[in-house]
């Protein structure tokens, strides 16, 4: 390996490390003080870098938060959906999603809470962030609906159940549960809520032979 190649590799490693630190600092600050009170200067300070580096790397706070949400989406299901559901359709697809969220809750509860907190920042009147988060939700819902709809053709969805409606019901229920979990962690058992939702979905949408499990 030549000196120039080694130098390039070290530079890429430093760049990757600084990006990870900046994203982590952003997640921490947004969780602590909210999007509005988080500044590029504070992000840089928390990560141990200059304000100038943050601006050069991402350009704006909204672009930085979009990058963070995208990274967390890759980790927590949105971008991982095709892999998670590669062999499941109908009710099995919905249950597989809930199982994955349950695993994430057990393995990385604080990171998962941070992901949901960032998604709810999309409610703020920030056009770029609002559109980005709305599109992320829409894409996730569309992908999941296609997998559930395939179950109608394979017998893995109860006859008469509308794939789009039951998918939207599931996603809305998870988002609502996540909101309550963020609001009142001491009194909201997120895992129990997911398990309860799974049982109700089986009763609602599983083929008759699955309804008693």
Where do the language-model regions lie?
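Short coil/turn segments at alpha/beta junctions that flank glycine-rich nucleotide-binding fingerprints
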Residues: 32-36, 87, 108, 154
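Basic, helix-initiating cap at the start of DNA-binding domains
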Residues: 1-33, 40-46, 63-66
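Hydrophobic/aromatic-rich alpha-helical bundle segments in the mid-to-C-terminal region
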Residues: 130-134, 152-200, 208-213
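Short helix-capping/turn signature of helix-turn-helix
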Residues: 58, 117-125
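Short hydrophobic/aromatic patch on the recognition helix
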Residues: 47-58
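An amphipathic alpha-helix adjacent to DNA-recognition modules
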Residues: 16-24, 36-37, 57-81, 95, ...
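Hydrophobic alpha-helical connector segments
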Residues: 67, 81-112, 163-170, 194, ...
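Amphipathic alpha-helical packing segments from all-alpha helical-bundle domains
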Residues: 77, 107-110, 127-154, 165-168
